[in-house]
Amino acid sequence: MEVAVLGLGEAGSRIAADLAAAGCTVRGWDPARRPTGIANADDPQSAVRGADVVLSINAAAVALDAAREVATALENETLYADLNTASPQLKRELADALPVEFADVALTGVVPSTGLATQALASGAGAERFAGLFRPLGMPVDVVGTRPGDAAGLKLLRSVFMKGLAAAALESLAAAKAAGVEDRVHADIASVIGEELLERLLSGSHAHAARRVDEMRAAAAYLEELGIEPRVAAAAAELLEELSAT
């Protein structure tokens, strides 16, 4: 299988490397990175030309421009999968902008750690095809709907809880430190949710604060679209923005 990977940051480069290790022919494109172990194209059109599957793993802010940039270079049978954390509306816009089958894919794990084995949700016209291609390569794919945006929406709703929980832990422990009881409060929280989860919430928030600001803003916008006031999502975005500036 020939796979083009657009975006070779932490997530994209790890997935590209895993695909190459699994026997796929991988061509990558990133204007700022050229990792070893895969073929690096000179431009995005060269990366996608002739590919069976295109994986867009750049960023929600550039996903639509990236799709439009390569649209005319795609083969009729190419499957275009967008793996960025984005709003359901953006996923629908991507599907409309592309002349090929589209899959909305939402990754719900820590990609730099688990790579191709990261749990994925998929929706859209190309979801079943995506699952059929990537499950044999080790990716656990759960097809959740036929509409682009269904997978993205589920991830964002999950993120309201997970990132909201992380924000609550960060705020609680910051206050506990100011009060001189950080160790006690840390132990109390860990006794409820487990030390492993607590450490993952704290370390992940610090390491990925900037990216998660965009995620929580997208979640807040989605809640508003659903008629729900995004109190927790908005507060989590604000806290993460402060954290990203430190």
Region locations from a protein language model:
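NAD(P)+-binding Rossmann beta1-loop-alpha1 motif at the extreme N-terminus of oxidoreductases
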Residues: 1-50
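Hydrophobic anchor at the start of a short beta-strand
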Residues: 3, 26-27, 102, 141, ...
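Rossmann-fold dinucleotide-binding core
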Residues: 63, 86-160
